[in-house]
C-alpha cells in the first residue's frame, strides 16, 4: 500500500547512487508507509552534499542550502533532498547554532525528534531502523530519539509536535518523554506564534485530540503562548476533531470575550471566519422562527451554520447553549438557502445612490438602516426585488 509516490521518486535515489552516494527515503513518508496511512510528501536524505546534488541534477532550487536542503525538480514534482547532517548546540530553543554535513546515515537519524520519524528506507523498500522506531510504531508510542530532555531543550516545538502526533496517530506518549515535556514546557515561550499555530491546526483535527488536548492543559502549555495565556483554558474541552477556526470561536464564546486575534498572526480570511463562527454561536439560540432563520442563513451563510450544528456535542461540553433542533435542522437550512431571493446586498435592484436621488437627503447612518430594512423585506417576501417596487417602497417608508 502507498508505494506509488516512492516509485515515482525512485529514479532520484538511483541517480544519486549512480554517482557513488547513498540516498534513502526518510521521515513521515516512511512512517506512514509502515502504518498503511496515506502518504503526502516524499523526503529524501543523502550522503551527497548540496553542491554534489546540484551537479547531479539539471533542475534544482536551493531552498535551504545552509541547512543542506536542495529541491530537486523531477518530472514536474519537487522533492526535498537533504544531506546527512549533524547539529551543534541549539540557540533560542528552536534552531541549531551550526549544521555540518556527515556521510553516515545513523548519525543523521539520531538528530531527529521521535523514533517513529527516525526510520529510513532504500529504493527497494529495505528498512534502516537504528532507534527501534518500528517497535514504537507497533506499540503505538511516541518516544524521543535519545535523551528526551535534550531533544526538547534543543527545540521546544518538539513538545507540541509530539502532542500533535499523539492526536493524529492515536498514539500514547511514553512516560519519560512526557515527563521531559513537563520539565521543558516553559521553553515554549521562545517559539514564534506562527510555528505554534501550524502545529495546533493539525493537532486539533486529529482523531485522538481529546487526549492531546488534556495533555496540553496538564502541561500548562497555553500559559506560555500569546492569545491563549489571557484565557482560562482549563474551562475548555475538545473531545472530537474540530477545525482551528471553530476551536478559537469556541474559546471566545466560552470566555464571553472579544479578545483580539492579532496575537495569533493568522490571515484576515481566518479572522473573518472565526468572528463569523463566534457571532453564530452567540446569536443562534435566539432564533425562534422560520423568518428569523431565513435572515440568519442570509447573514451568515448556510455552510457556516452547518459547521456549527455539526459540533453541537462540543458546544454542549463547553456549556455553550445550542440552537433548537426544531428550527436549525439541515433540511430547513438547505431549503431556505436554495430559495433565498438575494444572497448579498449587491443583488438588490436598488442602491444607496438611488435612494439619495429620490429622497434628496444627505448620506448618513440612516441610509445603511434603510438598505438593511429593504434587505429584510425582500428576504421575507414583503416586497419583490424589482427596481420600480423598491423605489415605491422607499417613497412609502422613508420620510423625505
Swiss-Prot record:
InterPro entries: Bact_CCA-adding_enz_type3_sf, CCA-adding_enz_C, CCA-adding_enz_firmicutes, NT_sf, PolA_pol_head_dom, PolyA_RNA-bd. ATP binds at residues 28, 31, 112, 155, 158, 161, 164. One of its GO terms (biological process) is tRNA 3'-terminal CCA addition. Signal peptide: none annotated. GO terms for molecular function: ATP binding; CCA tRNA nucleotidyltransferase activity; magnesium ion binding; tRNA binding. It catalyses: a tRNA precursor + 2 CTP + ATP = a tRNA with a 3' CCA end + 3 diphosphate; a tRNA with a 3' CCA end + 2 CTP + ATP = a tRNA with a 3' CCACCA end + 3 diphosphate. It comes from the Bacteria. CTP binds at residues 28, 31, 112, 155, 158, 161, 164. Its EC number is 2.7.7.72. Mg(2+) binds at residues 41, 43. It is an enzyme of class 2 (transferase). Keywords: ATP-binding, Magnesium, Metal-binding, Nucleotide-binding, Nucleotidyltransferase, RNA repair, RNA-binding, Transferase, tRNA processing. Belongs to the tRNA nucleotidyltransferase/poly(A) polymerase family. Bacterial CCA-adding enzyme type 3 subfamily. NCBIfam families: PRK13299.1 (NF009814). Catalyzes the addition and repair of the essential 3'-terminal CCA sequence in tRNAs without using a nucleic acid template. Adds these three nucleotides in the order of C, C, and A to the tRNA nucleotide-73, using CTP and ATP as substrates and producing inorganic pyrophosphate. tRNA 3'-terminal CCA addition is required both for tRNA processing and repair. Also involved in tRNA surveillance by mediating tandem CCA addition to generate a CCACCA at the 3' terminus of unstable tRNAs. While stable tRNAs receive only 3'-terminal CCA, unstable tRNAs are marked with CCACCA and rapidly degraded. This is CCA-adding enzyme. It comes from Staphylococcus haemolyticus (strain JCSC1435).
